[in-house]
Amino acid sequence: MTQQLTWHDVIGAEKEQSYFQQTLNFVEAERQAGKVIYPPAKDVFNAFRYTEFQDVKVVILGQDPYHGPNQAHGLCFSVLPGIKTPPSLVNMYKELAQDIQGFQIPAHGYLEAWAKQGVLLLNTVLTVEQGKAHSHASLGWETFTDKVIEAINQHQQGVVFLLWGSHAQKKGRFIDRHKHVVLTAPHPSPLSAHRGFLGCKHFSQANQHLLDQGKQAIDWQLPLSL
């Protein structure tokens, strides 16, 4: 594995592509027109700020950002401190409590501590209009995040991908299963969690795969309060 590669090295060229410029221009024009777009502009690329390319150990794929006030901040499934934990994350915490010995459910939904340990919390679409789920689904973000996954697939070794729900599983279809570990389950949403997300033991499995490679396991425990 090449240690010194950065996000800029592997996906920097995407920023020069016309599709990417068009996506950014559209989002900016929507903001200028007075529409409320989440997350705020400064947070759109936070997943890449908190987790440097060579530090990626685990990838959790989300769909698009939360579309309620003060929730989204650029990390999938995560919400800002002081905001009620959303239902899918409640189920993730339930699974962690069953799966990871001693895990205590925190009183918040802020997942920055995972990101700083090498868990890339990546939504496949990076912006959304307030109150309108999937409103930015066909802008070009998907092309960009495909390139992100391709870069990890190509340049890294032994990354554990957690793909929950059909959307994430389709997105991960080209990941090389000989180089990486792919764990799949239904989405943690209340609509589907009982179909096999709860009981999937993905968090402990991810850690076992990391330990088997001589990597440090993820400490899934979050601060109980912020």
UniProtKB/Swiss-Prot annotation:
InterPro entries, A to Z: UDG_fam1, Ura-DNA_Glyclase_AS, Uracil-DNA_glycosylase-like, Uracil-DNA_glycosylase-like_sf
Active site, renumbered: D64 (proton acceptor)
BP terms from Gene Ontology: base-excision repair, AP site formation via deaminated base removal
Gene3D superfamilies xrefs: Uracil-DNA glycosylase-like domain
Reactions this protein catalyses: Hydrolyzes single-stranded DNA or mismatched double-stranded DNA and polynucleotides, releasing free uracil
Subcellular location field: Cytoplasm
Alphabetized PANTHER family for the sequence: URACIL-DNA GLYCOSYLASE (PTHR11264:SF0)
Name of protein: Uracil-DNA glycosylase
Species, as recorded: Vibrio vulnificus (strain YJ016)
